[in-house]
Amino acid sequence: MTIETEAADDEPKKIEINNILVPIDGSEYSLKAAQYATRVARNEKAQLFCIHIVTPRMPYGYATPAASFTESRYYEDIKHKVELWFDNVRNMAKDEGIPDIKTEIFIDVKSVIESILDYASHKNIDLIVIGTRGRTGLKRFFMGSVANGVLQHAHCPVLVVR
């Protein structure tokens, strides 16, 4: 895969892809994005980073007085679910001949968009691969707000997968 940009002298300049980021939320779209990301990582011999962002809030079901769940249990449940998603991506990567991927779960007070962009900048990500929509039920949008925000503000190319 070759990504070219216009240099100052209008000559195409090839961008090296060494680090690829794929944000995962467990949706069908994020898993399709992970499939694309693993293929690109294989072709480019790039490191694949897979992250999930958790905003620090508890859903209504966890906050009822009768519920035995504590905040720490809430985060344990999320971690367990996300690790299953990561395992799925690890298996995809192994099928593509990629022995290891970097996975991280973040609890961040910033927006999911800001967290993804900060991570991409901090890890020197060369390409972000993201699904068109996440887990929200708002299907009226043509493209999810997170994907759109990342696409609009990322410092690097973004591949949006549907």
What do these predicted regions represent?
Residues 1-8, 119-162:
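Gly/Ser-rich helix-loop-strand patches that form or flank binding pockets
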Residues 1-15, 91-128:
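Structural beta-alpha unit
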Residues 11-70, 94-96:
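Small/aliphatic-rich secondary-structure junction motif
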Residues 37, 89, 116, 150:
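Aromatic/hydrophobic pocket-lining residues that form π-stacking "cages" and hydrophobic walls in ligand
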Residues 46-47, 99, 125, 156:
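Short glycine/serine/threonine/alanine-rich loop segments
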Residues 51, 102-106, 159:
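General small-molecule cofactor/ligand-binding pocket signal
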Residues 69-84:
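A short acidic, glycine-rich active-site loop
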